[in-house]
Amino acid sequence: MYAGKMGKTVSVKKYKNREKQTMKKTTEFTPTAFILGILLAVVFGGANAYLGLRVGMTVSASIPAAVISMGIVRLLLKRDSILENNMVQTIGSAGESLAAGAIFTLPALFMWAKEHGTAMPSFFTIAMLAISGGLLGVLFMVPLRHALIVEEHDRLPYPEGTACSKVLLAGEEGGAKAKKVLKGLLAAAVYKFLADGLKLFPSEVDFESRKLRGAGFGIDVLPALVGVGYICGARVSSYLLSGAVLGWLVLMPAFVLVGGDNILFPATRAIGTLTTWELWGNYIRYIGAGAVAAGGIISLVKTLPLIVTTFRKAVRGYGNTGRERTERDIPMRYVIIGIVAILLFLCVMPQIRLSVPMALFIAVFGFFFATVSTRMVGLVGSSNNPVSGMAIATLLLASFVLKLTGQTGLKGMTVAISMGTVICIVAAMAGDTSQDLKTGFIVGATPWKQQVGELIGAVVSGLAIGGVLYLLQAAWSFGDPELPAPQATLMKLVVEGVMGDYLPWGLILIGVFIAVAVEIVGIPVLPFSIGLYLPIHLSTAIMVGGLLRAFYERKKNEAYVQDGILFSSGLIAGEGLIGILLAVTAVLGVSAKFDLSGRGISLGAAGSLAAFLSLLVIMICVIKKQEKMEIDS
């Protein structure tokens, strides 16, 4: 029935037979699954939004959502349902993927409003753009499911989806595993409050070289970055750090060495007088932007043959499924009605009011990039999904079209970012939906129920993300050091460059050719380019997490590796949640009451490094202790 080794086919049938037996005693879409899924969607959506706005990266929430669900359903509610837990993680993980798409673009609208002195985008506008992209992402994925999830079961592993199914099938360990996530959450929450709430020590440590003028080095001692590095692994982390080393330890000193007393646009002072951060902001950031743009487009071009194959199989395979519960998707007529209704809504939505051609642009490129995303995550996982590349390609094309039709200035840029937002979220949601449907396929879930769960998660998460963005903007400001929003800043630069023709194109083209060179030598271009674009402080901390995982992988102890992933998921969620709570205190005007640095109490850089090392020790001890307890039991 499926291509590939018979062993794998039998394995899937075994899971489906097990599920058919349990279906006599349980259901999928319960009030518990609905409520718990919504809560997790809000939590992981908010946490990932904060993480993405701070460091420009997000991570998958499917496995931690499944683990927490099993812990609650099994330990507190005293029942065990694999399908109910699968529905919880399906709804809950929607928040992370929608946040990943939203933070890439939407903050640009706030930054333009601040720069031009116009009204901030309304909560309604932000939420509706997010919800529209989320719903379209799920609906575009529906006709692709049978071709990619079923027919190519053995050729497309969908790493996160398969891993999540293993967690669900090992449900008896749910309580113990949930504790690992919660311990990571607690550790990060306490750490984050000490660093950025009480300001007992700075969360960033800088080092400058006296002998190599212009060079800079540092580390952001943040729990979430360690978690990201551990989840990504040493290889991806090393690509990020390599790009950062090129920017901060090679290119920046080269600018100072060659530039000297010269003034080079966009800086307004002599290069030799600029600080490391000014060198990065005036030069390296634009070089990195060119590299990221080129890397994203290169990644898309490489997937074109796969896209054509996927589209053909989707058209041929949709509707050929049987009447069995595990083969039913949302009916195609409802999918089409939903897509048309959303596009019409975007045409009449206040503040945006897309033209019909622009709505059709979203439909065509939205489905195209949904196909790209779905196929890509099946091969390399959601963490390597080139969403930023898709967003850049969309913004470039949309901006050129709008400029040719006379829609320029702030209005034209707003429309371009709005279109980019929807398509970016479409790509992120389609990738997440495919991972969840892969999990459901293995454990024997009902596809149409999972798809409805994703739609619910998209609506709830869209409302939550709108609230989180407004809260963070009110507390700080997008583009400021506390909330740099690196990806949205990049998208803003892309649109401004096309509309205004005042970007330093020479620097951007240098970045483009760096990306081409990196691709030629066989290094994954996107993570390298992102490392070049982001400050080295982020990549350094991420590398620490990657090295810790590499240590356990060398010991060939998969249990340690998985325990670390769960703890790391908790670190990311804990820091994100405390970051949002600190934003609330800033809006209420009470954050200064917690600030000990204002009273002369601060441990300085030494305290930062000591706290960071303590966090690593805690992480190692928790992983080993948990594993020892499980072995003893």
Regions found by a protein language model. Give the residues of each.
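Alpha-helical multipass membrane-protein architecture
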Residues: 13-633
